[in-house]
Structures are given as structure tokens and as C-alpha cells.
């Protein structure tokens, strides 16, 4: 992937950029793998906002991605196309399996049209192949990692993300997460070789607020700019500092978002470094 910069023909275009989509080989998705997708605008079933700063955006169709590839062990597949997916930052790859079935996967870096993909413990260690952690050599960079055997890929699915297998210890494999945390995961869990492609996506300059609205992202308003009825930091005569330590709109102190006493904490070997004093 590359990034194409715009010339400053308008204030909104000045400094903005866009992906060049050079790796995309087809513009229309596979119809059998597309589902309708309705928008919630960040509201729950009662109409209350439960996820702020969401709403609007271009209409999308959902592409069904295969995050559980266990049932295709030993069935080779060919990469038919690399496609754009509006629902995620990564590109997706359309696989044609030897038994006639078609499926989408998240496209890893360096995967090309025409490549051969394998699943199962006997698969080669090459980008796009999916196999259990216990069959992957130590030091390998992986993505789309399961947290429970058969539970489907949960970790490292966005553009440019990856996890490194740093050690194996009995029934567990030790993984270095994107946050720097080292965690034990059941060695029977599956992972895909390589890192997720489209890594330069994070370098795109969106240029103007309107492009974020096309993506369905609404403005983020500071608490000190609100009225007292709307936020604990609101109100005051003129500009103020908020008058207290930073809190959420509901009065919860900022930071410390990890739940204490979580059962899976015992699997953490080394915690992520946050840079904050505890």
C-alpha cells in the first residue's frame, strides 16, 4: 500500500492524503458473502446513547469474514482477489477453496493474488497460513489470534497489527501483545502467520472534518466547553481548567480502565507499560 497526497487546491485538501489502493484487485464484493448492515447511531434498543460520537456515515454492506478456519484443515485455497472493506482498516482476501467454497479472510502483509493458502497443524510457516500456536516456531510474528480454542480470532485484526510468539511453556504459549503486554494463551489456540497488511493506513491525513463524518464519526466535545448540566467540568465564567482532576461525563476518574480482579489476569506474565503512576 502507498499513500497519495493531494495538492492544496482547497483548504480541506491542503495536507490531506488518501490510500492509493494499488493492492486492491476488485471493486465489487462477492455477493454470497455480503450481508445488510443497519446503523445504530451509537444507540441501544431503548434509544439512549451508549457509544458517544457515532452517527451518520456512508451506507455499508457487511462482508462476512472467516475468523474460524478449523473446518478447512487440509483443504488448500487460492487467493482470488484482494478487496477493500469499509468495515475495517485492513484489506480482505477472497479465498477459493479446492472444495468449491469461497471465504473472506483478513489480508496479511505480502499476500498477493494467486497465492496458495493452507490451514491445519501441517501448514507451512508462511503469511496467510493458519495453524495452532503449538505448531508455530518461537519468535514468529502472527495475527488473528484466538484467546480460547475454537473461539475465533480476537487479537491483532486491524491494519498493521501483529503479535509475537515469544515462548512456549507446557500447555501455554506466551505472546507479546501490541500493547507490550506478555500473556499466556492456550497453545491449542489458532493464529495466522504474518502481520496484517495496509500498515500505512495510520499515516493517512484525513484533512477535514467532513471525511470523518463520511466514516460515521461525530465531533468529540471537551467537557470544559459544556454546560454544568452536561459535564462535571462544564460551566464557569470565561475559560476554566475544569476545577478538578479529569473525569468522564458520569464523574468517573480518567484512566484505570482495566477491571481489577478479572479472572484472566492470572494469565498475564508482564503488564503493559502505561507511563502512568499507579
Curated annotation (Swiss-Prot):
Subunit structure: Part of the 50S ribosomal subunit. Forms a bridge to the 30S subunit in the 70S ribosome.
Bias type Low complexity, positions: 40-49
Pfam (any one): Ribosomal_L2
A GO term from the CC aspect: large ribosomal subunit
Molecular function terms, GO-annotated: rRNA binding; structural constituent of ribosome; transferase activity
Entries under HAMAP family matching the protein: Ribosomal_uL2_B (MF_01320_B)
UniProt keyword list: Ribonucleoprotein, Ribosomal protein, RNA-binding, rRNA-binding
Gene name linked to the record: rplB
NCBIfam families given in the database record: rplB_bact
Basic residues bias: start-end ranges: 210-220, 269-278
Name of protein: Large ribosomal subunit protein uL2
Region annotation Disordered: where it falls in the sequence: 1-58, 210-278
